[in-house]
């Protein structure tokens, strides 16, 4: 038992580029991150996420503060760095800090205030009272939105969802398209190492619009319970 993520290999017979998806959870056991990085950076190109902004530093306290929990004993995902012998080209497939800040300013003030207050409280709750089991239950994700996700929709949070999810989905798909549409790139194997919640957009692009098919799936253990 524990939390797992699915490593997916996709292929379109009409194109040379094979794609591997690594849906990420940003907290896990060291072995999980080591395996993912070693595998991903054996590809020709790696698309990665990361918004460098003081805003994201504040709102990611909800999981970053788990690092202090002796009960959970998990580590945070480290910065992307290729192994010494890797020749992979790293592509930043995310918003810049300035772009994210511009979208964040469109979020209603009371929603921003709530996020700023709630994030550290959630982080402290995880640190002091959380268990691996409770954290795993809160991070299950299917290919399609669940009933609970649909029911949680609120007009007040549209701008928040746009900043945190949708705008970043668009940028990721744009960067993916640039790689796939470049006939002279010489790329044969492409990896996407990105938050699990963003992989739905990638799968829609690859399966529905570009004719890719899942060739192989493999479970990776983020952490055991």
What are these regions (language model features)?
Residues 186-225:
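A cross-kingdom marker for long, charged
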Residues 1-167, 178, 182, 214-223:
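Structured, acidic catalytic/metal-binding patches in enzyme active sites
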Residues 166-167, 173, 179-183, 190, ...:
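Conserved, well-ordered alpha-helix/loop/beta-strand core segments that scaffold catalytic motifs
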């Amino acid at each position: 038992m524990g939390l797992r993520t699915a490593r997916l290999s996709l292929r379109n017979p009409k194109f040379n580029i094979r794609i591997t998806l690594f849906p990420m959870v940003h907290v896990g056991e060291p072995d999980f991150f080591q395996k993912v990085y070693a595998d991903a950076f054996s590809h020709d190109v790696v698309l990665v996420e990361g918004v460098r902004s003081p805003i994201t530093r504040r709102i990611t306290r909800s999981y970053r503060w788990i690092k202090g929990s002796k009960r959970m004993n998990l580590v945070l995902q480290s910065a992307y760095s290729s192994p010494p012998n890797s020749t992979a080209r790293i592509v930043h497939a995310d918003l810049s800090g300035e772009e994210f800040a511009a979208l964040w300013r469109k979020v209603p003030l009371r929603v921003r205030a709530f996020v700023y207050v709630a994030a550290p409280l959630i982080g402290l709750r995880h640190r002091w009272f959380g268990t691996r089991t409770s954290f795993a239950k809160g991070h299950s994700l299917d290919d399609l939105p669940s009933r609970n996700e649909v029911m949680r929709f609120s007009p007040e949070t549209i701008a928040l969802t746009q900043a945190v999810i949708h705008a970043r989905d668009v940028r990721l798909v744009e960067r993916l398209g640039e790689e796939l549409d470049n006939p002279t790139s010489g790329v044969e194997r492409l990896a996407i190492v990105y938050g699990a919640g963003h992989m739905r957009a990638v799968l829609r692009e690859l399966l529905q619009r570009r004719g890719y098919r899942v060739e192989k799936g493999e479970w990776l253990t983020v952490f055991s319970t």
